[in-house]
């Protein structure tokens, strides 16, 4: 059984765009034999999204017009529930934080994930 690896990128910081590049590059180099990758994009407005469409960098040129291609998610506050969607939950075993700047490099997201 593969490990579910959530890769977090984007965010509200001024380094939002470079975080997208970092996240996509990290995903590209993950060993897909060992991990099922769950891309998790944090939009500029703070909403969280997941879906395979996030793997295409072109999606981010006009995300607002394209966001119907992905699902909005939120982090459960119940330990072990992972990410919640309108149609169930997504189990997360490991998180890779590829966010730069505010809420990424300051440990805020890490702290939030540790509480979940």
Where are these regions (language model features)?
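ATP-binding N-terminal substructure of ATP-dependent carboxylate-amine bond-forming enzymes
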Residues: 1-116
């Amino acid at each position: 059984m593969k490990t579910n690896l959530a890769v977090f990128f984007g965010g509200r910081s001024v380094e939002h765009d470079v975080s997208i590049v970092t996240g996509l590059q990290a995903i590209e180099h993950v060993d897909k034999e060992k991990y099922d990758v769950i891309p998790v994009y944090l939009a500029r407005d703070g909403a969280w999204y997941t879906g395979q469409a996030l793997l295409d960098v072109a999606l981010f040129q006009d995300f607002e017009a394209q966001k119907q291609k992905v699902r909005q998610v939120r982090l459960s506050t119940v330990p072990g529930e992972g990410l919640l969607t309108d149609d169930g939950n997504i189990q997360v075993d490991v998180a890779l934080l590829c966010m730069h700047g505010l809420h990424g490099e300051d440990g805020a997201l890490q702290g939030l994930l540790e509480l979940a």
